[in-house]
């Protein structure tokens, strides 16, 4: 089933172009090179750029089955295959066992989430967040399971802040509509700029439901990005 679905998705170019997780010819290396190039170009042009690094809280476990099935249908996965996925999600059960004992909890019906460790789980999650970039025509999105980057640049630091706060609210509303939440402690932003260009204004980024912390550097996909890109 995985091969059939991935072949169909790639044939009709359904995955977002900056969707880098679990796709052929779209590795994290490509994502890192793309982001680094964007930042470097911004610094060379004398503009300010901001990377907002989102960390989704229990991303795979909170996927809403009804929303996911609706998205599968939207992407053209219908008929027998759609029914197969509906059956795949129905009546899934889980229980908790105490290690080293024969004590087990009662079975509970699983109403959300995609199976972690499965072949289909990551692919289904990528389809679940595939339409996130549609919530903003201003931001550039780099998508990866539970680790998404938003990028924007502007020559004026005050305009950068104003626009980002407006767009961040759109992202927050998308997350709410799709029943996903951010790990606030691990979500942060970095303002990238030339070492010779001092920032007189400290950015404050927030939405109606959260405030994003500012940091001088962030570790993203194993690479540390510093505000001066040094």
Regions found by a protein language model. Give the residues of each.
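Conserved pre-catalytic core of RNA-dependent polymerases
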Residues: 1-115
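Active-site palm subdomain of RNA-directed nucleic acid polymerases
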Residues: 4-17, 122-152
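Catalytic palm active-site di-aspartate
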Residues: 19, 49-59, 85, 113-121, ...
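Hydrophobic alpha-helical membrane-association signature
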Residues: 31, 35, 124-128, 164-167
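Structural signal for well-ordered, non-membrane alpha-helices
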Residues: 40, 93, 133, 169-176
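Catalytic palm subdomain of template-directed nucleic-acid polymerases
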Residues: 59-75, 149-176
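Short, conserved micro-motifs composed of acidic
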Residues: 102, 166, 181-216
């Amino acid at each position: 089933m995985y091969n059939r679905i991935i072949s169909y998705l790639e044939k009709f170019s359904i995955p977002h172009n900056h969707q880098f997780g679990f796709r052929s010819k779209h590795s994290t290396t490509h994502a890192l090179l793309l982001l680094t190039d964007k930042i470097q170009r911004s610094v060379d042009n004398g503009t300010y750029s901001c990377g907002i690094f989102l960390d989704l809280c229990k991303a795979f476990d909170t996927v809403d089955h009804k929303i996911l099935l609706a998205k599968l249908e939207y992407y053209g996965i219908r008929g027998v295959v759609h029914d197969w996925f509906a059956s795949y999600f129905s009546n899934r059960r889980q229980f908790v066992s105490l290690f080293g004992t024969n004590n087990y909890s009662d079975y509970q019906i699983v109403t959300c989430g995609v199976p972690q460790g499965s072949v289909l789980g990551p692919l289904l999650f990528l389809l679940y967040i595939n339409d996130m970039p549609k919530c903003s025509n201003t931001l550039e999105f780099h998508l990866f399971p539970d680790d998404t980057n938003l990028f924007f640049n502007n020559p004026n630091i005050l305009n950068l802040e104003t626009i980002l706060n407006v767009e961040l609210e759109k992202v927050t509303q998308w997350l709410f509509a799709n029943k996903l939440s951010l790990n606030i402690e691990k979500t942060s932003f970095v303002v990238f700029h030339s070492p010779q260009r001092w920032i007189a204004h400290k950015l404050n980024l927030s939405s109606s439901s959260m405030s994003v912390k500012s940091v001088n550097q962030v570790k993203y996909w194993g690479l540390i990005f510093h505000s001066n890109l040094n």
